[in-house]
Amino acid sequence: MLRRDPRKPLAILRHVGLLCATGPQRWRFQHSCAEEHSNCARHPLWTGPVSSAEGTRQSPINIQWKDSVYDPQLAPLRVSYDAASCRYLWNTGYFFQVEFDDSCEDSGISGGPLGNHYRLKQFHFHWGATDEWGSEHAVDGHTYPAELHLVHWNSTKYENYKKASVGENGLAVIGVFLKLGAHHQALQKLVDVLPEVRHKDTQVAMGPFDPSCLLPACRDYWTYPGSLTTPPLAESVTWIVQKTPVEVSPSQLSTFRTLLFSGRGEEEDVMVNNYRPLQPLRDRKLRSSFRLDRTKMRS
């Protein structure tokens, strides 16, 4: 079930890039509004302010039905992954991430809002401290307990992921909401190895894994031009957010919360609330591949 976001009220200081909030944080590293604006160690990957003052197409966003426009020209998204290209799962110090050999041209996505073929690079999750929140995107102000991101790069236009990640139309990210429900058998393969990567910078080898098993059966989606939600916040992403969530069990999500932001020998810092603040839509067009039906969304 969709839940109203308990994190409001929330204000982002656009000029200094620091965050003030009541309730749960949209970034786990929260600083006083009176603090000097500086790039201090909010997070080991962080190199800039919480909010990009110059950015005009930042992510994530609150997907509002009133802002969504049905586009009959949006084709179905074509998804074809090579399970054998899965390499390892690791704790990045911000989330756990599954890496793939992206030299395989055939493993990726095309169609939908995309003009080129995009190769799969990695996927990761964002989640909250409880089952009440955790997704990066929201829908009419409602959030899910977690969100999956499958990250792909434009192999037609760019030589490698690094160049694509900061280039125009360089990345395509599929977002999938996770909601509480039935046990997810395919996800369990990942959950089973999480104890081996509890600490930051630890990894475990993975056998074949096809991440299409994590996608919903219904492939209706919203799409909009946006950015990475972690530094460097590059505005290189075509977002493809699935309308239909996938079900996972409470125990599976609880295992996510056993991971740590901290490394071995450091004070334990539980890995939760690893999501970015919502960003304004501004004048961007939010398109949908489906005709809007509110009654079917709230499930």
Swiss-Prot record:
pH dependence text: Optimum pH is 7-8.
GO biological process: gluconeogenesis
Family: Belongs to the alpha-carbonic anhydrase family.
Binding positions (Zn(2+)): H124, H126, H149
Cell compartments where the protein resides: Mitochondrion
Record-linked SUPFAM superfamilies: Carbonic anhydrase (SSF51069)
Gene Ontology molecular function, alphabetical: carbonate dehydratase activity; zinc ion binding
Enzyme class: lyase
Top-level taxon of origin: Eukaryota
Main location as per UniProt: mitochondrion
Record function comment: Mitochondrial carbonic anhydrase that catalyzes the reversible conversion of carbon dioxide to bicarbonate/HCO3. Mitochondria are impermeable to HCO3, and thus this intramitochondrial carbonic anhydrase is pivotal in providing HCO3 for multiple mitochondrial enzymes that catalyze the formation of essential metabolites of intermediary metabolism in the urea and Krebs cycles.
InterPro entries per the UniProt record, alphabetical: CA_dom, CA_dom_sf, Carbonic_anhydrase_a-class, Carbonic_anhydrase_a-class_CS
Phylogenetic lineage: Eukaryota, Metazoa, Chordata, Craniata, Vertebrata
Residues covered by the Alpha-carbonic anhydrase domain: 30-290
Keyword terms, alphabetized: Lyase, Metal-binding, Mitochondrion, Transit peptide, Zinc
Cofactor: Zn(2+)
Entry protein name: Carbonic anhydrase 5A, mitochondrial
